[in-house]
Regions:
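Conserved donor NDP-sugar-binding/catalytic core segment of glycosyltransferases
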Residues: 1, 219-265
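A recurrent flexible, glycine/aromatic-enriched loop bordering the glycosyltransferase active site
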Residues: 1-23, 35-37, 195-198, 261-303, ...
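Conserved nucleotide-sugar donor-binding catalytic segment
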Residues: 4-91, 300, 310-315
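C-terminal, non-catalytic tails of nucleotide-sugar-dependent glycosyltransferases
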Residues: 19, 79-126, 250, 262-289, ...
Length: 404
């Protein structure tokens, strides 16, 4: 990808071949420092990127890197001092930037990828917005998993009732409110049909939290610290949307960030990869910047949601989240994916699939509207991935170039 701060804070993805001015190096504090031996290039890149006004990426194979047995190119664990130096370089970087962190550690089982635990200065309330229509077993699984597993200290759940018919649904609402009187409420949207954007915009009016979490009713929490992992990024002024790693019930990837332009609009990176997979160059293991996140589980500060005008209600079902993330980026914020917040997503159970002519017509209309609105950006490509990948695929397959 192009320069992405969170990627660099997770691993030295820039690696070796870099050109910069002597003036920039002097301004950044001079050449490589041998006290960071083994990760001296990483430490230098962190200092240079703190100072540089513009960083350019050339997306072409300009050189080949040798790999010999016992070298860090083949296995960094062969030289553990490199890992220690990388952690020290990151801690020094955060100190210079005035960023408070609780810990920096090697992600277990990875060849030099780092996890930063940012200090959560103020654990502000998270308002969890869940649109729902019948399918009460899915909702019960979702809500019960939140209360049973979540360790974050301050959250509220706002169930956005959307034209349910089953009496059991309303009995369940009453029971849930009785069990959680302090932080669960039900609000009723009076519109007809299904409009995910309108439902969330309506629910947001009742939110008392500093943060909004858009969450599908067909999800289930896996990791207890999921909200801490998301809030530690959403609290940062530079960050807009934060997305989680979502798994299908068969433990394959449903969402690990959205690639912009895939299939003509957008697609889920690493979709259907095994949950245990490292992904392309380890990208399923570490926090990284992405163009967009799915709104099936998306955290954002409420002030940013209001700043960009919420979800666009002309996108009733598809691409409302991608359109929202594009507008958040246009407002100057960075969107992030973290693999350390994990949930199951039993996708589209309550709404159904695009399986009839009416739904297909609506879907095509949303595709055309999105392409008309963001055509220039789609043509420019996704800086969070690489133009050498096949834009029709979500699995990081290389583009096949025609023979000249």
């Amino acid at each position: 990808p192009d320069f992405m701060l969170d990627n660099l804070r997770s691993n030295n993805y820039i690696c070796h071949l870099t050109l910069f001015s002597r003036r920039l190096m002097d301004a950044a504090g001079g050449p490589e420092r041998m006290e960071y031996n083994g990760s001296q290039d990483y430490e230098l890149f962190l200092r240079l990127t703190e100072t540089a006004r513009k960083i350019v990426h050339i997306p072409h194979a300009l050189y080949y890197w040798r790999s010999s047995p016992g070298s860090t190119a083949s296995d960094i664990s062969a030289k553990t001092y490199c890992i220690d130096a990388g952690i020290a370089a990151l801690k020094a970087h955060y100190a210079r930037c005035g960023v408070a962190v609780d810990d920096v550690s090697l992600i277990p089982g990875t060849p030099g990828y780092y996890k930063t635990d940012y200090t959560i200065d103020h654990p502000g309330r998270v308002s969890i917005l869940i649109p729902t229509c019948d399918h009460i077993r899915d909702l019960e699984t979702c809500v019960e998993s939140i209360y049973a597993r979540t360790t974050y200290p301050d959250f509220e759940i706002i169930l956005i009732e959307n034209n349910s018919k089953a009496p059991e649904t309303f009995r369940t609402y009453k029971r849930m409110q009785k069990e959680h009187p302090d932080n669960l409420k039900v609000v009723t949207w009076e519109g007809k049909g299904f409009n995910y954007s309108a439902l969330n915009n309506f629910g947001e009016k009742f939110a008392t939290g500093e943060y909004l979490l858009l969450l599908n009713n067909d999800t289930e929490v896996i990791t207890a610290a999921w909200l801490e992992e998301m809030v530690m990024y959403a609290q940062q002024k530079r960050v807009g949307c934060v997305g989680a790693k979502l798994l299908y019930p068969d433990d394959t990837i449903q969402h690990a960030g959205v690639g912009f332009g895939i299939g003509g609009v957008a697609g889920h990176l690493h979709k259907y990869y095994p949950a245990s997979s490292d992904g392309y160059m380890g990208r399923l293991n570490y926090v990284q910047d992405v163009y967009a996140d799915t709104a099936a589980c998306l955290l954002i500060r409420k002030e940013i949601y209001d700043e960009v005008g919420g979800l666009d209600e002309s996108y009733a079902v598809a691409f409302n989240d991608v359109d929202f993330c594009v507008r958040v980026r246009q407002a100057g914020y960075t969107n992030v994916f973290t693999p350390f917040a994990q949930l199951y997503h039993y996708e589209s159970k309550s709404r159904g699939m695009e399986d009839n002519p009416e739904k297909q017509k609506r879907f095509q209309g949303e595709v055309l509207r999105f392409q008309a609105r963001w055509g220039d950006l789609l043509a420019a490509g996704d800086p969070c991935t690489n133009p050498n990948f096949d834009i029709q695929r979500e699995d990081f397959s290389l583009k096949i170039l025609p023979l000249e």
